[in-house]
Amino acid sequence: MVLAFGARVSTKDVDAIFQPTQVVRDVARQVGESLGFEIGWLNDAAKGFVSSRHETTNAALPQFDHLRLTAPTPEYLLAMKCMASRIGVVSADADDVRDIVFLIRHLKLGSAKEVMDLVAVYYPANRIPIKAQYLVEGLYAEGRI
């Protein structure tokens, strides 16, 4: 959200899919220790939300000889965020909610149905959690979109 969309100034961690997994984790731990980052600053939790229709882009992302950066397309990222639907206890805008609102606005989706239809493009209907539908419907009902 920070690098690919400029949606906010900073993030507490970097979500990535990387290989070789253990080698990258070991190096990330060493880098984190030397820079004073929290444990888990680089994580691969996003791999649990990878769709068989895995759509990425490298547009506007820096590229290096030794590192290839890609990001999910906005549509795919919105679907992933809806699948996760992590809602913070402390703040109404915690976790995925702020990102979901940003992406819905970015994509100019006019209704909760449009959002959920988009999610269904990437994930089978029987895998989409009902909390995602309730969250998205609530955002529209509250006028946050």
Enumerate the language-model features and the residues they cover:
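Compositionally biased terminal segments of proteins
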Residues: M1-I145
